[in-house]
Each structure stands twice: as C-alpha cells, then as structure tokens.
From Swiss-Prot:
GO biological process entries: glycine decarboxylation via glycine cleavage system
HAMAP family referenced in this protein's UniProt entry, alphabetically: GcvH (MF_00272)
Protein name as annotated: Probable glycine cleavage system H protein 1
Species for this entry: Sulfolobus acidocaldarius (strain ATCC 33909 / DSM 639 / JCM 8929 / NBRC 15157 / NCIMB 11770)
Names of required cofactors: (R)-lipoate
The keyword Membrane belongs to this UniProt entry's keyword annotation: no
Gene that this sequence comes from: gcvH1
Domain of life the protein comes from: Archaea
Amino acid sequence: MSVVIDGKYLILKDRHYTETDEWILINGNIATVGITDYAQKKLKDIVGIELPQVGREVTIGEQVAVVESVKAAADIFSPLSGSVLEVNKELQSSPETINKDPYGRGWIFKLKIKDEKEVSKLLNFEQYIISIKQREGI
C-alpha cells in the first residue's frame, strides 16, 4: 500500500522513515535503508554515490553515505545503530537507479540492528507525510 502526497511524492506504508528522508524496511533484525521518493525528487538527477564499508559499526544518526546529484550532494544517515551487512554495489555503476526505483532496486545498504528499541524513534508513514507537508507548506 502506498500514499501519494500533493500528486508527486510516493510514500510506502510498509516502511519506517526519518526526518532526514531515509526509508527503512525491517525484516527481523535486518534493516534495508534507502532514500525516499521525496528525497530523490529534491536531488534530481543522481550521478554518484559513496557507499559505507561492509562491516562498519554505525550509530543512530551517523553519516554513512553520500548521494551526489547534478544539483547537490546529500549525506545519508544511519537510522539505527548496528553493523553494515551489505551495500548495493549496483549503485556504483548505475546511481540513477535511486531515481528510477528508490524503494526497490535503489536501496543503499543493509544493517544488522544492534538495539531494536531504537526502531520506536523512527517515523511511521503517517508521521513522515506530516513532515513533508510541513516542509512543503501543503
């Protein structure tokens, strides 16, 4: 299930979100992380990415990756504490995949969650919709 905000921003109901526009899909103690449709549309044409190193221990809110577009570079933050299990190597040669499929093939990294209690700090889809509406003045 999904929701479209203001006729342009797709939000999936099965994800968690952050105020910094990362989405998180949790399966057991594994979190798959990417940037939202809202974020990729704000960045426009994505041309590069710096991925985190597999095995890296990260804490909630830590900068872990950078997405580069023709317009700007955007830091990607870890939504939870844990260790990086996998990165989407396809993005190194095809970073535009994030623009084409931000919630699917455009995922950025997978994280083994260290503290499942941190999940409660994430936004649900309704809270994320409110966040976007406030920023966009809609």
